[in-house]
Amino acid sequence: MPSKRSLPAALKMARKARGLSQEAFSDVSSRTYLSTLERGMKSPTLNKLAAISRVLTIHPMTLLMLSYTGGNNAEIDALTARIRREISALKL
């Protein structure tokens, strides 16, 4: 079973929180492919992650944030602040 802090766990957590079955993603992915993602057997491309996120009606970064924080609010705040600092330091 994947750790609570992983993309497979975040996918499953978000899907269940939305009350969706794996079959609900049939327009963007097969049930078997989604199952392999949730079990950590494959990694999605950014395009596939975006398509899955659209079905979940969340931003792809939300899934990534859940992947790194497990949904812990303090960790979400800390990671958001870090990302803001790092982007600012790039001086784009």
Which residue stretches match the model-derived regions?
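Short alpha-helical DNA-recognition segment
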Residues: R18-R39
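Residues that mark the N-terminal boundary/hinge immediately upstream of a DNA-recognition element
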Residues: A10, G19-S21, T45-K48, H59
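A short, Lys/Arg-rich alpha-helix, primarily the initiator
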Residues: M1-A17
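Short, charged recognition helix plus adjacent turn
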Residues: M65-L92
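Short, basic-rich loop-to-helix N-cap that marks the start of a DNA-contacting helix
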Residues: M41-R54
